[in-house]
């Protein structure tokens, strides 16, 4: 049987935000979501021109282990659950070397009614220390408009991961006029509070740093003219989500 391959978009060798400590981050190719504020639309297509074996991908990361110290490690992001078997094997290799692992995911491919898929996902979770999950919008209809997909399986994955005892970091992108209404944030707060393994909640302010990528790809940018949130709006959202109540909250 041929070895599982992973299709990698890019890597970051000294990441400081996608998990605890210093991280080596592998960004995989392929994503079914079409988030209106996506800053990496070039990763949507499932291209196969950058194939690596799990051992090759892990070996490239492990060269940077001296930077990780006690709390850093390896994060895999991008179209990760579309390449679940590859990620599972990379994380198995990482745990064999006592490397901390984090899965940064949109959770869109989560398939709780597919027994074979869930068996593979359980195998992945066995070697996953942290799941970083983007909860983009708590209202399902608004979520469909924002991303092109329902959030039902995404919320179900959050609950499943928490029930398995895996630590969670939750992120929410704050877009003025779209994802910032107080009632929606309160509902999101209630959902997150019911997840017993959440260690951190983050507000990610909307930005336009990826706008040029949409332009280069010839894709109309759906949020043209939308402003970035103010510091006051960010602080208000952080209060509504009680971000300082969680164990891994950044210390001032």
Residue positions per predicted region:
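N-terminal [4Fe-4S]-dependent radical SAM core
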Residues: 1-27, 33-48, 63-70
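Auxiliary Fe-S-binding modules of radical SAM enzymes
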Residues: 1-17, 174-252
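Short glycine-enriched, charge-decorated loop/helix-capping segments at active-site entrances
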Residues: 42-46, 144-150, 218-226
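Short cysteine/histidine-rich metal-coordination sites, predominantly Zn2+-binding motifs
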Residues: 49-59
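Short, conserved loop/turn and helix-capping segments at secondary-structure boundaries
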Residues: 51, 148-151, 228-231
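Conserved AdoMet/S-adenosylmethionine-binding subsite of the radical SAM
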Residues: 62-66, 70-73, 82-204, 209
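Active-site beta-strand/loop signature of hydrolases that rely on acidic residues for catalysis
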Residues: 79
